[in-house]
Amino acid sequence: MARTTPIERYRNFGIMAHIDAGKTTTSERILFYTGVSHKIGEVHDGAAVMDWMEQEQERGITITSAATTAFWSGMDKSMPQHRFNIIDTPGHVDFTIEVERSLRVLDGAVFVLCAVGGVQPQSETVWRQANKYSVPRMAFVNKMDRTGANFDKVVEQLKARLGAYAVPMQVPIGAEDGFEGVVDLLKMKAIHWDTASQGTTFEYSDIPAELVDVATDARSFMVEAAAEASEDLMDKYLNEGDLSEEEILKGLRERTLKVEIVPVFCGSAFKNKGVQAMLDGVVHLLPSPADRPPVQGIDEDEKEDTRAATDTAPFSALAFKIMTDPFVGSLTFFRVYSGTLNSGDQVYNPVKSKKERVGRILQMHSNNREEIKEVRAGDIAAAVGLKDVTTGDTLCAQDKIITLERMVFPEPVISMAVEPKTKSDQEKMGMALGRLAQEDPSFRVKTDEESGQTIISGMGELHLDIIVDRMRREFNVEANVGKPQVAYRETIRKSDVKSDYKHAKQSGGKGQYGHVVIELSPMTEEDRKSDNVKDDFLFINDITGGIIPKEFIPSVEKGLRETITSGPIAGFPVVGVKVKLVFGSYHDVDSSEMAFKLAASMAFKQGFAKASPVLLEPIMKVEIVSPEDYLGDVMGDVSRRRGVLQGQDDSPSGKIINAMIPLGEMFGYATSLRSMSQGRATFSMEFDHYEEAPANIADAVTKKG
């Protein structure tokens, strides 16, 4: 079957934003204007098409990125048809993992910002993630109809807080209740959308007299930004003082693709104004798969390799999301980077070293689906029937193996015990948690060996609340939940601490003998660059001359690695430690792998105790927005929680307080902040770093442990 849309007319992009910037409403309008959805769904009444998990509809926040395919021929229907693959991403801090996943497979992004709230803490997190993957992006300043809307202020914040070279493509006509439309700086015309047709029709008119000067200045800034793309454009601009519409778009597109500028559009998705012109911007300014560099990976021989975005290249794809679907079972969402795939084909998963057959291929539209026979370079689709694929795995042709970059997922910072309410829930709970962990790599499940309890870990209280909620709804498992526990870590401060341990047992017949001398040190920045660092631990074998035979060295490392999962202070994982094996001895008959494993484990425990062991606690970056009246109480409370204030900013709803606060002090903070501010203050937090816990905290944790 031939390709229906040339790859140059594909746009794979994500809609990203802070919670409450109006992202889901914006996505809904996109689906409406691209003809997919005939009734506009409103988040306010829990009917949005993109938010298809029950909880999202209740909470009014987007949790799972749903992939949707749509088509666009321009606001005035004059463009050739473009194919949009849109991924809606969550804006809540506990779900940054979802954002990270979708950014990995997108070519571009539209940042939705609130015209009142501006750049908020999550915006910074998502922006940093987009920088990590060099994702070209544009901004859409939404909610221009709301009280306190200020387009210029948001553009300034983009520059000041995110370091973006923001280039407005439009100027708003009015604001708040008086928001009417926009001035298109390319055409230097005013655009008004027709309310009766829900914004599907529009008209151009002359720019209102009071905005002519503002629009002229803004246009000059835009044209200058375009001219800086190349010497030819700059020469023409300097000689003639202007550029044609085509040249401006060419220059701006080049610079957007290089992530040098961020074009800015504005509107009100809720009032059906502005989204249509922003979609034209997606076509003009965001990349097609062919504009992005070939995807990089490594071949079977661990050598670097690439795949170009063409149908003739060998097939390669990345699985970026696994979902359990009530009708078809497990769905694997994947992005095709190169080649073609037909339903029924076999693919190879180099991460698991397994072949799998792709059953059906589904083109997803939010929660509707259409079965298709094949996918090609640039497509995003979902496969049914893949059993052993996890998020971040590569799928490729068996005869041309490539492993694309693995996604790196953060370690969970919070844990809690869960137990089934009834015996019949026991088995179902194990299956439910297994499924949920397969879908979400930032969620972990383990059994505590001592207590036999099931421990779940994740990125925040809301994250775990939603997991427990999903167990109830999707798997009918009722569970009791323990109190949240902080994920502490253990490390050492002293360097070059020697530890010598001999494991020798003689009791008739074959004895046991293993003797090791190790040196413990904290890892340096240089150490961290080593390829041998795994789980934040480095093992170095310094044995020469066969003092310990080669075949026992892996047992020494294994003994060490097994010991660091439960540290000597309070049973938390050990991090940031380097262990050198420097000396030892063996016995021809009595030495065994087990003996060396035990010797290494005991040597580590004894050495760790002598190396100034310390407990580390997770520190959260917290941003609180509070009306001025409650500022004193809020800041006093931050200090009581051992918080360190990082600074203050102004915001339309009061003051923004930035602080670093230990996670152990943040449980139940949402409730206490609400009562302190009569429900008017809000906060968000994300994990920032680990640091040494004060002695009183360490003692309390150790006693508990």
Curated annotation (Swiss-Prot):
Coiled coil as UniProt keyword: no
Spans annotated as Disordered: 290-309
Record keywords, A-Z: Cytoplasm, Elongation factor, GTP-binding, Nucleotide-binding, Protein biosynthesis
Localization per record: Cytoplasm
Keyword Protein biosynthesis in annotation: yes
Domain of life (superkingdom): Bacteria
Gene Ontology CC annotations of this record: cytoplasm
Matching Pfam families: EFG_C (PF00679), EFG_III (PF14492), EFG_IV (PF03764), GTP_EFTU (PF00009), GTP_EFTU_D2 (PF03144)
InterPro entries reported for this sequence: EFG_II, EFG_III, EFG_III/V, EFG_IV, EFG_V, EFG_V-like, EFTu-like_2, G_TR_CS
Residues engaged in binding GTP: 17-24, 88-92, 142-145
Gene Ontology MF terms: GTP binding; GTPase activity; guanosine tetraphosphate binding; translation elongation factor activity
Residue intervals of the tr-type G domain: 8-290
GO BP term, example: ribosome disassembly
Coiled coil: none
Primary localization class, coarse: cytoplasm
Protein's job: Catalyzes the GTP-dependent ribosomal translocation step during translation elongation. During this step, the ribosome changes from the pre-translocational (PRE) to the post-translocational (POST) state as the newly formed A-site-bound peptidyl-tRNA and P-site-bound deacylated tRNA move to the P and E sites, respectively. Catalyzes the coordinated movement of the two tRNA molecules, the mRNA and conformational changes in the ribosome.
PANTHER family referenced in this protein's UniProt entry, alphabetically: RIBOSOME-RELEASING FACTOR 2, MITOCHONDRIAL, TRANSLATION ELONGATION FACTOR G-RELATED
Assigned protein family: Belongs to the TRAFAC class translation factor GTPase superfamily. Classic translation factor GTPase family. EF-G/EF-2 subfamily.
The protein, known as: Elongation factor G
Protein species of origin: Xanthomonas oryzae pv. oryzae (strain KACC10331 / KXO85)
Gene name of this polypeptide: fusA
